[in-house]
């Protein structure tokens, strides 16, 4: 009896993480890494009928008991609120939100439909806002918490052919800056991770969203962009780097605001800061020849 009570007390003392987009990529790896670090993890995904990749990885690393898979569609505020209510009802706390759900819509601006533009922002921007709004009252009341928004290097420098994705990540930059300043007085840290290219599913979905129409005036340009993007996405960069960074930030009592990560990201940021825009244009367009 005493052992059971002690185990219950220990469970109550465990920090709780709420992760969106946990079915694959950074969200899946971060969920497992946080569980390894001692978190109780609410790993959410839009379709809970396909959690196998996450549950198999968690079992292989011996942390399946620390993970709970819940449905949460970030484009449905009620779905997010229900998952947050479950977390609070079960564990009584949420210490960390990892806003990871998202995808990359590709295509030239003229050819991306308004429906595709809106869908990109519904998931990447409004979904992140909805998740933050759902946890903020609790974090503010408890006087602590961390929100990690997964941005992108595309939120700092935009490339042709991915305007919807870049625009959504630029929006996350502004949202995160403002929210960081709003919540600082309440003990809630807002952090922005800006990954470069990693071999995750987000890019495969992005490539699939680009339709190469023979009649398109942009066909040749899009073919070059796809070729360059596939080369970048097939790099040997390890997505566990991002999961490990998330875990380190979660453990940091005073995390900084921005964390660019990945091969070449700091060089790109330095180039955009130091070089004249006309030179950046020439370099990018030459790269895509």
Enumerate the language-model features and the residues they cover.
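Conserved glycine-rich cofactor-binding loop
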Residues: 23-24
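Conserved glycine-rich Rossmann-like NAD(P)H-binding loop of the short-chain dehydrogenase/reductase
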Residues: 37-54
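The beta1-alpha1 cofactor-binding region of Rossmann-like NAD(H)/NADP(H)-dependent oxidoreductases
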Residues: 71-82, 114
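Substrate-binding pocket helix/loop in short-chain dehydrogenase/reductase
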Residues: 108-109, 116-118
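Active-site helix of classical SDR
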Residues: 132, 168
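Residue(s) in the substrate-gating loop at a strand-loop-helix junction
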Residues: 152
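C-terminal beta-strand-loop-alpha-helix "lid" module of Rossmann-like NAD(P)-dependent dehydrogenases
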Residues: 184-233
